[in-house]
């Protein structure tokens, strides 16, 4: 199973993406800032990161 990290400060965006990705069979991790994202990346084997750069 592929794992995806969704990182965005907008919780609604993260929730919506998580719903769609999980429905397609992906394991989804959440982060709401860069520090949280780095912690997830240290602890999990992540295949793809989706993030808002703005």
Which ranges hold each PLM region?
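Non-catalytic signal-transmission and effector/linker regions of two-component phosphorelay proteins
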Residues: 1-5
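Walker B beta-strand of ABC/ABC-like P-loop ATPase nucleotide-binding domains
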Residues: 6, 50
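Conserved functional loop/turn residues at catalytic and ligand-binding sites
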Residues: 8, 25, 45
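The short loop immediately C-terminal to the conserved phospho-acceptor aspartate in CheY-like receiver
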Residues: 10, 53-54
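Two-component/phosphorelay signaling modules centered on CheY-like receiver
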Residues: 11-29
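Acidic, metal-coordinating helix/loop segments flanking the phosphotransfer/catalytic sites
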Residues: 30-48
């Amino acid at each position: 199973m592929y794992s995806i990290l969704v990182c965005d400060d907008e919780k609604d965006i993260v929730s919506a993406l998580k719903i769609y990705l999980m429905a397609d069979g992906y394991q989804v991790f959440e982060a709401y800032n860069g520090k949280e994202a780095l912690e997830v990346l240290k602890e999990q084997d992540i295949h793809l990161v989706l993030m808002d750069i703005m």
